[in-house]
Amino acid sequence: MYRLINAVSENSILSQYETSADLEAYFRSCGCDGLEVIRCGEDDRKIVTPEMVVGCHLVFYSDWVDFWLGRQDRLQYKFGSPEVVQQMYMCDNRDDFIAQFKADMDYAQRMGAKYAVFHVSDVSIDEGYTYQWEHTDKEVIDASIELLNICTDGADYSFELLLENLWWKGFSFTDPDLTKYMLDKVHYENKGIMLDTGHLMNANTAIRSQAEGCDYIHRCLDEHGELSKYIRGMHLHQSVSGAYVEEAIKNPPPHDYDYFRSFAEAYDHILTIDTHKPFTDPAVRGVVERIAPEYLCHELSAKDNAEKAEFTRLQNAVLDGKI
């Protein structure tokens, strides 16, 4: 099993490392074997090297299905103008949107990544407060299937394409029939699931502890039966925020027609739901041992690299039975 940390490939973020050796020394000090990288710009100094890249996280947009379907009325309501739409998606048409995903897949291939991750999810700012949905799970899954098939049909990629669960509309790993439907309809043969434990815990607002979260994950694995064998990787973290969500949805803010202001205000709300904290309860060992993933990425939030290293070592210690 590869133990990994997530990293952002972008000049300003990578500026904290003088050399590639510094970055490698950092993730080794965390007890990890390599990186899951998301490309958010250029890496002009080539700090991230193919030797350290095990996985790549593909570009993602939280709210993209209406853009994909060309629903101009919804885009106008949510973003206010074509100019803001252009700023959000860095394009104004399907072909250029598709090109962004293909470019990330090409990058994953060039870097020798063993896997690439795709978010099968959609949520607007308003939905993130109300939990009242504009799309069904199947609508989001169908849009994702269409995009992925366009990107991969006829391509000669060698990486595993891993589909990640979230708690919004789309793939949540809570409905085995939808999980099977999604896997059946994606043409790419070398496919599987990236199970995000914190996201799965977010899907059940009744959870009040890490242990209850682990029990819920086991229950979802039970319900998925043989489909669980498609889990090739895990994003490991915990989130116990159900009580917050149950209170927050009682009094959602009104729709704000200033998109960038509403996005900034929603950011803290989302981080309060999806906390990306390290597991400290030994119950998580049973989850990881049961799944036995090939790739385990410690996807943890932290204020700086030192804290991230501390949290990663802590979660590794829990996995190793030292806590």
What is each model feature region?
Residues 6-12, 37-40, 56-63, 118-120, ...:
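A cross-domain feature marking catalytic cores of carbohydrate-active enzymes
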Residues 31-32, 51, 158, 190, ...:
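A generic structural signal for alpha->beta connector loops
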